[in-house]
Amino acid sequence: MQLEKMITEGSNTASAEIDRVSTLEMCRIINDEDKTVPLAVERVLPDIAAAIDVIHAQVSGGGRLIYLGAGTSGRLGILDASECPPTYGVKPGLVVGLIAGGEYAIQHAVEGTEDSREGGINDLKNINLTAQDVVVGIAASGRTPYVIAGLEYARQLGCRTVGISCNPGSAVSTTAEFAITPIVGAEVVTGSSRMKAGTAQKLVLNMLSTGLMIKSGKVFGNLMVDVVATNEKLHVRQVNIVKNATGCNAEQAEAALIACERNCKTAIVMVLKNLDAAEAKKRLDQHGGFIRQVLDKE
């Protein structure tokens, strides 16, 4: 796909004179354009849901969720991956973010790395990619060689693959088994795909990882019941989670959490089923860690 023909490289008439307006009007123009992004994502919800189901099936079978991108797209993947262990208590490495140029590229522009097909393949080889894994290639343009080559390699291994881009019919979309293509239109600053395209990608990644965690039993109601208490704020959140899930008071919630080494799921089952920590944990294990199943089937 030629660069000049890409929607993400087009000129936005709404911002054609943004350099001549007041600061407040600049903000209004940007905000008005940003309002269109959730609607673009809404149009591809069926594609996102299909990807979530595939990701969940593979992860349930022992696979991993791998994000692969360059520049802003790579950073968004790393951001999403890095939040999964503290929020949902999963092991580091279950959700992996890879960026062209490696760790240095998280904070710095590393010229030319996104054009390296070998880089995309080698980064996947270095994490010992297997057919159980799901590779999600992220590229606003849909033409990034690093991502395309990684998706091709993943498919050769038998991996399920997802391509996220903002240009219809892009190489990323056609290379991946599942395509998610929110069309956000031309950017406020021509070609600055960190803006609307980046926002759309972030919304999609939020859904992919959150959907996976909900389907994996990491959410009860709308509570993050596997949150790891790594600071005082999260200690308080754990207490509130147990309170909200059970109707008990703060003292009862804290006592249950202490008794089970601060595992929210176990504490919730302890309170709701009037069990000690060992028995509550046993029942959770019997039902794959799903609180709902413990409550509904016993």
Curated annotation (Swiss-Prot):
Catalytic residues in the record: E83, E114
CDD domains: SIS_Etherase
Example of a GO biological process term: peptidoglycan turnover
Assigned EC number: 4.2.1.126
Reactions it catalyzes: N-acetyl-D-muramate 6-phosphate + H2O = N-acetyl-D-glucosamine 6-phosphate + (R)-lactate
Similarity comment: family membership: Belongs to the GCKR-like family. MurNAc-6-P etherase subfamily.
Official protein name in the record: N-acetylmuramic acid 6-phosphate etherase
Species name: Shigella sonnei (strain Ss046)
